[in-house]
A protein has these predicted regions:
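Membrane-interface helix caps of multi-pass small-molecule transporters
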Residues: 17, 21, 33, 37, ...
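Membrane helix-loop-helix hairpins that form the core translocation module of multi-pass transporters
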Residues: 43-115
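Interfacial helix-loop-helix linkers and transmembrane-helix boundary segments
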Residues: 60-74, 90-100, 120-124, 189-195, ...
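Hydrophobic alpha-helical transmembrane segments in multi-pass integral membrane proteins
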Residues: 44, 85, 89-90, 95, ...
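Hydrophobic, well-structured mid-protein blocks that either form specific transmembrane helices
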Residues: 101-143
């Protein structure tokens, strides 16, 4: 039990730090290990979601004046609808299948962001918003890591890093709130999840403080590539275990 408490605390620090520094990645980071220490995959994604929601809430309180709703609502509405559907499907899927899908997803995400993110530009049209929201909803509902598709959209739509951070965190806050309600309805919000949240919340605040300093002073490009490599290795591990 003591080891689990320490792991949750450290994972929460790392995930919150990544989220605060880059604007996304809480679920990607924490879901590399969380499924192995939680009773079920659904409970792991639920705990990841409420911890990520807390991280986003802290940032939104600080950056709310930079929110532009007309660029946010179309992708957000799409995400909510798709992610809720994915959560209902999740209840009926086998764990080893999810392990395989998660491993493949993490490898693809790591390769994309390491090599292609700077080369691909997207327009902020309604079809793009719906597509990004759909992909984000599928990844969020199944794996608790809805960030990559949404981040690509917001990087292109926002004029500076302050607007980018405000928009991404408002998106993640609202999305995680809706997914948490759907997961609770499906029985994934258990006593174990509540206890895990208590263990992880202190780590969330610590990671947010450190990440805030890094966001102000460093570019973080080297950090991103380290994270992408870690995600890819983790994805390969999931595939081998499955």
């Amino acid at each position: 039990m003591d080891n689990i408490v320490i792991e949750l605390f450290l994972l929460s620090i790392g995930a919150s730090f990544v989220q605060r520094t880059t604007g996304f990645g809480f679920g990607i980071f924490i879901m590399t290990m969380l499924p192995s220490i939680m009773p079920s995959f659904g409970e792991a994604t639920t705990l990841s979601g409420i911890l990520a929601m807390t991280t986003s809430l802290i940032i939104v309180i600080q950056k709310y004046k930079y929110i532009t709703w007309r660029r946010l609502l179309p992708i957000l509405f799409t995400f909510v609808i798709i992610s809720i559907g994915a959560i209902f499907v999740l209840k009926r899927m086998e764990y080893h299948i999810l392990n395989i899908l998660l491993g493949i997803t993490q490898i693809i995400v790591s390769i994309y962001f390491a090599f292609f993110s700077k080369r691909i530009k997207v327009k902020t049209t309604l079809p793009v918003q719906v597509t990004a929201g759909t992909l984000s909803g599928l990844m969020g509902g199944f794996f608790g890591m809805q960030g990559p598709p949404a981040v690509l959209y917001f990087v292109s739509s926002e004029p500076d890093k302050e607007h980018y951070l405000a928009m991404t965190q408002t998106y993640f806050l609202a999305g995680n709130l809706m997914m948490t309600l759907a997961r609770a309805y499906n029985g994934f919000f258990t006593t174990t999840v509540s206890i895990g949240y208590v263990y992880g919340i202190a780590g969330v605040f610590i990671g947010n403080l450190i990440g805030s300093w890094v966001f102000r002073h460093l570019s973080g490009s080297l950090l991103k590539y380290i994270i992408y490599a870690y995600i890819g290795i983790s994805g390969l591990t999931f595939l081998l275990e499955a």
